[in-house]
């Protein structure tokens, strides 16, 4: 068993080193070769992630309660639970892994906006993708899906372009956000089917 762990260790170390090199190389390309005229737009949109991810589900919950619409209330509850799950997972990983921000480690990265907590995973990206996925599952219409995912993708890109996240941070944020929304959609769907 000891040999197994040593073998895994000696295989993983070079892979992690390579992954870190690929991560910073891609970030360097995105950050240093960005169209700086887009910086104000990207700074603006990046800061919509958290507020929109929390306000939209809560607003739907209020509307559903006022209208006494059980179907809408159920969708809103799934969204609220999805967002909370994604936030808990992301925050736990951030402070467990405690990865420094790219601009803290690499002086050539241009930091264009704020980034305070640890880098991995991207909380803004998680927020954007949990909401985009939950909205798309709740209201599967093109006029909802396309804008939701364009918004989420713009936020994900902005985190790298503005120099505050590595591509791996963003990718894992996408996976956590999408995964949380899918998980709770499946759980609630299976519960509804078992009652039928």
Describe every region a protein language model picked out.
Residues 18, 61-71, 137-140, 183-189:
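Structural signal for the C-terminal ends of transmembrane alpha-helices
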Residues 66-69, 95-103, 164-168, 189-194:
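Transmembrane helix-loop junctions in multipass membrane proteins, especially transporters and channels
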Residues 108-196:
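Membrane-embedded catalytic cores of phosphoryl/pyrophosphoryl-handling enzymes
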Residues 8-11, 79, 83-87, 174, ...:
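Alpha-helical transmembrane spans of integral membrane proteins, capturing the lipid-embedded, hydrophobic core
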Residues 2-57, 90-117:
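N-terminal transmembrane-helix/juxtamembrane module of multi-pass inner/ER membrane proteins
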């Amino acid at each position: 068993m000891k040999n197994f762990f040593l073998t895994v260790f000696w295989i993983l170390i070079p892979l992690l080193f390579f992954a870190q090199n690929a991560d910073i190389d891609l970030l360097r390309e995105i950050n240093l070769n960005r169209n700086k005229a887009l910086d104000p737009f990207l700074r603006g949109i990046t800061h919509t992630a958290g507020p929109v991810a929390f306000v939209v589900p809560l607003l739907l919950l209020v509307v559903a309660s006022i209208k006494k619409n059980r179907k809408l209330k159920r969708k809103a509850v799934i969204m609220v639970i999805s967002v909370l799950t994604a936030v808990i997972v992301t925050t736990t990983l951030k402070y467990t892994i405690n990865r420094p921000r790219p601009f803290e480690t690499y002086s050539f990265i241009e930091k264009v906006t704020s980034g305070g907590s640890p880098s991995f995973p991207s909380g803004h990206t998680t927020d954007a993708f949990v909401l985009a996925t939950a909205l798309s599952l709740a209201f599967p219409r093109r006029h909802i899906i396309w804008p939701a995912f364009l918004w989420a993708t713009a936020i994900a890109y902005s985190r790298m372009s503005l120099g505050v996240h590595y591509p791996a941070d963003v990718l894992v944020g996408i996976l956590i956000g999408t995964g949380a929304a899918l998980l709770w959609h499946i759980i609630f769907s299976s519960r509804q089917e078992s009652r039928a």
